[in-house]
A protein has these predicted regions:
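N-terminal auxiliary segments of SAM/dcSAM-dependent transferases
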Residues: 1-26
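Hydrophobic beta-strand segment of the Class I
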Residues: 35, 132-133
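Class I SAM-dependent methyltransferase SAM/SAH-binding core
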Residues: 65-121
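A short glycine-rich, Lys/Arg-flanked "PGG" loop and its adjoining helix->strand segment in the class I
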Residues: 145-160
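Conserved class I S-adenosyl-L-methionine
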Residues: 160-190
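Core SAM-dependent methyltransferase catalytic element
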Residues: 223-246
Length: 246
């Protein structure tokens, strides 16, 4: 009997389950050195404000342990490190981590720990961290449910889960404007600034394929988190999701 292969979405393309991690890896290896340019292009520069707001919601505290997953370039970790929290920056992509380490060296920042990790199979003990953060990363995971289950596993009782991700805006008319921008203009921006139209097209498509806010909230609850919340920004173009391991 032939074994039926499973497919998953890679943007608008359906690919074999076993292929997605490698394809996503190739995208982020390509954009690693231009990561800030990519985020500026996707958010018109507002990602910096969103990330500041995200960190205010996390409220990192001195002495606690935080896992910043898919945090390779250190964008979120650098915002949290002065709190005195012990932060591990994890990413599946070596090039993204290398970019973060280089930035840390430029800043003379030695307080962060860097670790190459797959969000679906974390190499950390149970109940290890006080908080888990992931920003603009979970939509690129092959099995989102497995990544959420791992986040729940590595959090201590009373631990906090925070995720910021693109979604679909509910502002009348703005959704069409953003769809036009992300699907037709953004790839051309990618070609102009990074000579990489395909990666930017995937990133736009991956946003469109990500579950709506309330559906993703239900996935977080299904992973075992309690007191889940969704905080939409720009009408839901971006949302901060949170939950507790209790």
């Amino acid at each position: 009997m032939a074994i039926e292969s499973k497919t998953v979405s890679f943007g608008y393309e359906e690919v074999e389950e076993s292929e997605k991690t490698g394809k996503v890896g190739a995208v982020f290896s390509s954009v690693a050195s231009k990561y800030d340019v990519m985020n500026d292009a996707m958010s018109a520069g507002t990602h910096r404000l969103w990330k500041d707001r995200f960190v205010r919601r996390v409220k990192p505290r001195a002495g606690e342990t935080i896992l910043d997953m898919a945090g390779g370039t250190g964008d979120i970790a650098f915002r949290m490190v002065d709190s005195g929290a012990h932060i591990t920056v994890a990413d599946i992509n070596a090039e993204m981590l290398a970019e973060g380490v280089d930035r840390a060296l430029d800043k003379d920042e030695t307080r962060l720990v860097w670790s190459q990790q797959n969000a679906e199979t974390l190499n950390f003990p149970d109940a290890h961290f006080d908080a888990y953060t992931i920003v603009f990363g979970i939509r690129n995971v092959t099995h989102i449910d497995k990544a959420l289950a791992e986040a729940h596993r590595v959090l201590k009782y009373g631990g906090r889960f925070f995720c910021m991700e693109f979604s679909q805006t509910r502002w009348p008319g703005f959704d069409k404007i953003y769809q036009t921008y992300s699907h037709h203009i953004l790839p051309k921006v990618g070609k102009a600034v990074a000579n990489d139209e395909a990666s930017y097209r995937y990133l736009a498509e991956s946003i469109a394929k990500f579950p709506p806010m309330e559906d993703f909230r239900a996935m977080i609850q299904a992973a075992g988190f309690s007191q889940t919340k969704v905080e939409p920004m720009m009408g839901g173009l971006v949302a901060i999701h949170s939950g507790w391991e209790v």
